[in-house]
Amino acid sequence: MAARWSEKNPDLKGAALEDAMQKEPWDPSVKGLTSVPQVLAMMSDKLDWTQQLGEAFLAQPDDIQNAIQVLRARADEAGNLKSNKEQNVRRVAATPSPGYAGPPEYIVIEPVEPDYVYVPVYDPVVVYGADYWPPAYVPFFWYPRWWTVGPVIGFGAAAFVGPALWYHYNWGNRGYAAVQTNTALYSRFNRVNVTGGGQFQN
């Protein structure tokens, strides 16, 4: 439903999008995704994948997060993960956490401009290699209408997400708080009163 709404309202952004979201009964996480319609469209087109990913994250969050780092490392080793005008790629040291054994450092990917996100489009077999997936989980290559054959990793137009993405992933301290929440941005987009002074909260 949200994906169809987004397709019908492609020009709504910023404050206008915030206002429109107040009329919809969706979960705040769904409302936030309307700022990145390309991601929302892929999740809608591949509902079985979206459900499986959600269930896997609920049951095995550490395994999912480790898998992300393994794939980023593979892309980096193949020369397919680099900083550019859309994103910054850097490594951060991990904070030791009781009861959790993770890698000593993490690969972090951040937008060059904090309020804008460029959603990457790529063939996972090309970026990660032809043997990275288990036989039971053959990868798929989802691409938007504008996609044409070009660089290994392509990017669409910038999506303004300043007020909509209120979560920040804390890779360096996963054992204690994987996700931090910016209460001011959450409150602004969802018109609710959450204390916290506008800072990222654990």
Protein language model annotation of sequence segments:
Residues 1-99:
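Mature extracellular/secreted ectodomains of secretory-pathway proteins
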